[in-house]
Amino acid sequence: MGALEPSWCLLFLPVLLTVGGLSPVQAQSDTFPRCDCSSVSPGVLAGIVLGDLVLTLLIALAVYSLGRLVSRGQGTAEGTRKQHIAETESPYQELQGQRPEVYSDLNTQRQYYR
């Protein structure tokens, strides 16, 4: 543990200010002028948090219900379409027996590569 990390230095800052004759509150008030802003009461803060949770749950519920509706609609149409394709077409080509004329020219060209 050779050198102190920056987070440890921040922990020692109030101690250094107190030893130097300044309390952390005095140092802050001298550096930054007092703000005349309105403070947020705990009730308002709790209302914001609860409202956020309710809206998040409503959005999740809406996405879930829409996802179920879309997958149901596509699932039935897709299933009948797949059955229709399976009845009309085969994805595999039938074997057509041996055709020696396809490979007959390979034997004639082989002598050039020797």
Curated annotation (Swiss-Prot):
The protein's location, in the record's own words, is: Cell membrane
Could you say which protein family the record assigns here? Belongs to the TYROBP family.
Q: Positions modified as Phosphotyrosine?
A: Y92, Y103
In this chain's numbering, which residues are marked as the site (Important for interaction with transmembrane receptors)?
T56
Every copy of the ITAM domain together lies at: 81-109
Consequence recorded when altering Y103F: Abolishes phosphorylation and ability to regulate cytoskeletal organization
Q: Which residues does Ca(2+) bind? A: D52
Q: In which tissues does this protein get expressed? A: Expressed on microglia (at protein level). Expressed on oligodendrocytes (at protein level). Expressed on macrophages and osteoclasts. Expressed on dendritic cells in liver, spleen, kidney and lung with highest levels in liver dendritic cells.
Q: InterPro entries per the record? A: Tyrobp
Q: Which organism is it from?
A: Mus musculus (Mouse)
Q: One GO term of the cellular component aspect?
A: cell surface
> What is this protein called in UniProt?
TYRO protein tyrosine kinase-binding protein
Extent of the signal sequence: 1-21
Write out the topological domains of type Cytoplasmic: 64-114
Disrupted gene: resulting phenotype? Increased bone mass and failure to generate multinuclear osteoclasts in vitro. Thalamic hypomyelination, synaptic degeneration, reduced startle response and aberrant electrophysiological profiles. Enhanced proliferation of B cells. Reduced number of microglia at sites of nerve injury and high rate of neuronal survival. Impaired macrophage fusion. Defective osteoclast cytoskeletal organization and function.
Give the free-text PTM comment from the record: Tyrosine phosphorylated. Following ligand binding by associated receptors, tyrosine phosphorylated in the ITAM domain which leads to activation of additional tyrosine kinases and subsequent cell activation.
A molecular function (GO) held by this record is: protein homodimerization activity
Q: Where are the annotated segments for Disordered?
A: 74-107
Please report what switches on or represses expression of this protein.
Induced in microglia following nerve injury (at protein level). Induced in liver dendritic cells by physiological concentrations of lipopolysaccharide.
Q: How does it sit in the membrane?
A: Single-pass type I membrane protein
